[in-house]
């Protein structure tokens, strides 16, 4: 069975406390010796008992170890002092930089002398020149980039135009032309043979058909009466009909004749 966990507290029994001290002291010195041998470390152990008895162990010598320990402590203290001094210097520099920053912004100028103000003015002037030069360089670079982009765009447009021209050369050209089997002759409306009114008049005189409603006897009597009424003007009707027939013949001959014959006839 394993050893039980021992509660870490002061042992009240003096005999038990002395026995435990002797065992733990021997173990501690043994562990220190092993540590110095195994790890090549400089180890020193100092133990005082309840009664004031001294027990010690040192791998290289107690005085040498204690001297080294003292030097280390003094160096640590001096290093701490150096660190504190460096912190103070950095704080002072930070405050000066903050004050300088405010002065560059035009604030806190009252404590400055005339020479300090002149120096500040020179600093601002040189800073302004540097800013302007940097600004001009940036604008020049942007202008150059814009020109390069413009040249690229022009080259792309030229390439696209050439491609379009090449495509048009491959496609047939469509032109509006009049077929050879259609012939058109321009005629002046003033010299037209038949106008709209004459056409209507001819169409109206093509037929003479009437429709009469009534009983057979009444229709026969009406026809007889109408024949007697129209008999006196038969000669005039015949004359009008013959004149209209002659006009129709002349118009048909003119319509079928070539344009040169039409012009000659109109000129005569």
Swiss-Prot record:
Location(s) in or outside the cell: Nucleus; Cytoplasm
Main localization of the protein described in the UniProt heading: nucleus
Domain MADS-box stretches: 1-61
GO BP field: cellular response to auxin stimulus; embryo development ending in seed dormancy; floral organ abscission; fruit abscission; fruit dehiscence; gibberellin catabolic process; negative regulation of DNA-templated transcription; negative regulation of floral organ abscission
One function term, GO molecular function aspect: DNA binding
Residue ranges annotated for the K-box domain, each copy included: 80-170
Pfam families, per database record: K-box, SRF-TF
Keywords: Activator, Cytoplasm, Developmental protein, DNA-binding, Flowering, Nucleus, Repressor, Transcription, Transcription regulation
Biased composition (Basic and acidic residues): 218-232
Chain residue ranges for the region called Disordered: 205-268
Residue spans of biased composition, Polar residues class: 233-244
Name of the featured protein: Agamous-like MADS-box protein AGL15
Assembly description: Homodimer. Interacts with SVP, AGL24, AP1, AGL6, AG, AGL1, AGL11, AGL5, AGL16, SOC1 and AGL21.
Function: Transcription factor involved in the negative regulation of flowering, probably through the photoperiodic pathway. Acts both as an activator and as a repressor of transcription. Binds DNA in a sequence-specific manner in large CArG motif 5'-CC (A/T)8 GG-3'. Participates probably in the regulation of programs active during the early stages of embryo development. Prevents premature perianth senescence and abscission, fruits development and seed desiccation. Stimulates the expression of at least DTA4, LEC2, FUS3, ABI3, AT4G38680/CSP2 and GRP2B/CSP4.
Effect of disrupting the coding gene: Early flowering under short-days conditions (SD) when combined with AGL18 disruption. Decreased ability to produce somatic embryos in vitro.
Cytoplasm keyword on record: yes
GO CC, any one term: nucleus
Induction: By auxin (2,4-D). Feedback loop leading to direct down-regulation by itself.
InterPro entries, per the entry: MADS-box/MEF2_TF, MEF2-like_N, TF_Kbox, TF_MADSbox, TF_MADSbox_sf
Tissue: Expressed at low levels in flowers and siliques. Also present in seedlings. Detected during embryogenesis and accumulates during early seed development (at protein level). Expressed in shoot apices and the base of leaf petioles.
């Amino acid at each position: 069975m394993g050893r039980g966990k021992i509660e870490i507290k002061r042992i009240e029994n003096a005999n038990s406390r002395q026995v435990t001290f002797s065992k733990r002291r021997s173990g501690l010195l043994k562990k220190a010796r092993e540590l110095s041998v195994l790890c090549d470390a400089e180890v020193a152990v100092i133990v005082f008992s309840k009664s004031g008895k001294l027990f010690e162990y040192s791998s290289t010598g107690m005085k040498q170890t204690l001297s080294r320990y003292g030097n280390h402590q003094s160096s640590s203290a001096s290093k701490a002092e150096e660190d504190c001094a460096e912190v103070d210097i950095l704080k002072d520099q930070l405050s000066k930089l903050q004050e300088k920053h405010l002065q560059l912004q035009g604030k806190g100028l009252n404590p400055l002398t005339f020479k300090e103000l002149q120096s500040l003015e020179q600093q601002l002037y040189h800073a302004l020149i540097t800013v302007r030069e940097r600004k001009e360089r940036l604008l020049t670079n942007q202008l150059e980039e814009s020109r390069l982009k413009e040249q690229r765009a022009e080259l792309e447009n030229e390439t696209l135009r050439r491609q379009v021209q090449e495509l048009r050369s491959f496609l047939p050209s469509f032109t509006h032309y009049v077929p050879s089997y259609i012939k058109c002759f321009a005629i002046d409306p003033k010299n037209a043979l038949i106008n709209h009114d004459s056409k209507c008049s001819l169409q109206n005189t093509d037929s003479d058909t009437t429709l009469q409603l009534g009983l057979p006897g009444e229709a026969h009597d009406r026809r007889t009466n109408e024949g007697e009424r129209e008999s006196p003007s038969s000669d005039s009707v015949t004359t009008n009909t013959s004149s209209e027939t002659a006009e129709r013949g002349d118009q048909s001959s003119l319509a079928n004749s070539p344009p040169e014959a039409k012009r000659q006839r109109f000129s005569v």
